[in-house]
Regions:
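Terminal domain-initiation and capping elements
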Residues: 1-91
Length: 91
């Protein structure tokens, strides 16, 4: 006789869908690297290194996820990024 251990993992629906949103910033021909870096530091609480790396990814790949969190926390940050002239959206 063999015994099999049955394991059930309970994951609540809220847990599974809580942090599925992210802010994506897109490349444009208008904003300078310095403006993008300063804005990411101010709005998204990036370190200077994070902001610089994100700006390079945005430039070379056309877009970069700069923040991941619940929608309610991302919405005001995305609005600030848009107000600063960056192309951004929550996905």
């Amino acid at each position: 006789m063999s015994t099999k251990e049955k394991v059930r993992e309970r994951v609540s629906f809220k847990e599974a869908t809580t942090i599925n949103n992210e802010i994506v910033v897109y490349n444009d021909d208008v904003n300078t690297f310095d403006h993008v870096i300063d804005t990411l530091i101010r709005v998204c609480d990036h370190t200077p290194e994070q902001a610089e790396q994100s700006s390079l990814i945005i430039h070379y790949n056309g877009k970069c996820t700069v923040k991941t969190d619940v929608y309610e926390k991302l919405k005001p940050q995305c609005i600030q990024l848009l107000a600063a002239g960056l192309s951004a959206e929550i996905v």
